[in-house]
Amino acid sequence: MTFEKVGVIGAGAWGTALAQVAARAGLAVTLQAREPEIVAAINDTHENAVFLPGIALEPGIKAVADLADLADCDLILAVAPAQHLRAALTAFAPHRKAGAPVVLCSKGVEQGSLKLMTDVAAEALPGAPIAVLSGPSFAGEVARNLPAAVTLACEDEALGRAIAEAIAIPTFRPYTANDLIGAEAGGAVKNVLAIACGIVEGKGLGRNAHATVITRGFAELTRLAVALGARPETVAGLCGLGDLVLTCSSPQSRNMSVGLALGQGLTLEQALAGKVSVAEGVASAPAVRALARKVGVEAPICEAVAAILAGEVAVDAAIAGLLSRPLKPEA
């Protein structure tokens, strides 16, 4: 199976960066944006000044506003924010070319339903071949052609290889897997943990505490993913541990920057003020907490972040609660 035309749903930073990758791979790229001004700017100036300012876009990228304009695309990258993915895919469903696979590139748990993105896609696009792309990949670096590697998970392994081969370039390496739940669970939970790491930084609690949050957070991530049906070796790869380390280690991370502001004493409203791109962890935190409770998984760091974001507990009290937990075996 080969692909020639790629449609990208969502022209935020990550969607635009993936459009860059696909264009560099020699594919014809149609990038859909809801905002008419972004469509016009990309087509006229070859720049997404709102989400990726200062980065020249590949000439092979064409921007559109109407999802119907993706009807001739034989591969779809769905990059709408997690809480808007269902609406985007439902609107796109009548226009999907028969047999066109849909690669889910959004990370999160849907509020209310507590569904992962593959479940959302299966309901919005019945019968569509689904894959998941996830891994340590800041959009700005990918768009500037700096090296990155990701997980491309698809139950149909031949299809997964075909998609990986279609979008791979020397600076963007997709490693294939067949564990969709593992690929997406890691990406959903790591955003919540990145907020926790940001809080640690904002409070000045030191590198020891930072490393502890990453490590114990990864234990929470793994427990939840396995309870949902993932294999532990999947979340130990790029889509889980790799993405967690990146997102928890740089203020470039939208989620970590929110936590940093909270740790410095700002309110959530102040922390989010002026942010153009979505910090998925803010929306996913209550859903991750509810999902962990539903499947009986202990996730104290995710619980604390969700409680802080909901205004149920102050930052200092949440930290004190974590530090006073009973001692237990590490495993």
From Swiss-Prot:
Reactions this protein catalyses: sn-glycerol 3-phosphate + NAD(+) = dihydroxyacetone phosphate + NADH + H(+); sn-glycerol 3-phosphate + NADP(+) = dihydroxyacetone phosphate + NADPH + H(+)
Source species taxonomy: Bacteria, Pseudomonadati, Pseudomonadota, Alphaproteobacteria, Caulobacterales
GO process annotations (BP): carbohydrate metabolic process; glycerol-3-phosphate biosynthetic process; glycerol-3-phosphate catabolic process; glycerophospholipid metabolic process; phospholipid biosynthetic process
Alphabetic keyword roster: Cytoplasm, Lipid biosynthesis, Lipid metabolism, NAD, NADP, Nucleotide-binding, Oxidoreductase, Phospholipid biosynthesis, Phospholipid metabolism
GO MF: glycerol-3-phosphate dehydrogenase [NAD(P)+] activity; NAD binding
Presence of the UniProt keyword Ion transport in the record: no
Family matches, as PANTHER family: GLYCEROL-3-PHOSPHATE DEHYDROGENASE (PTHR11728), GLYCEROL-3-PHOSPHATE DEHYDROGENASE [NAD(+)] 2, CHLOROPLASTIC (PTHR11728:SF1)
Gene Ontology annotations for the cellular component aspect, listed alphabetically: cytosol
Principal subcellular localization: cytoplasm
Family per similarity comment: Belongs to the NAD-dependent glycerol-3-phosphate dehydrogenase family.
Name of the protein described by the UniProt record: Glycerol-3-phosphate dehydrogenase [NAD(P)+]
Organism, as annotated: Caulobacter vibrioides (strain ATCC 19089 / CIP 103742 / CB 15) (Caulobacter crescentus)
Superkingdom to which the source organism belongs: Bacteria
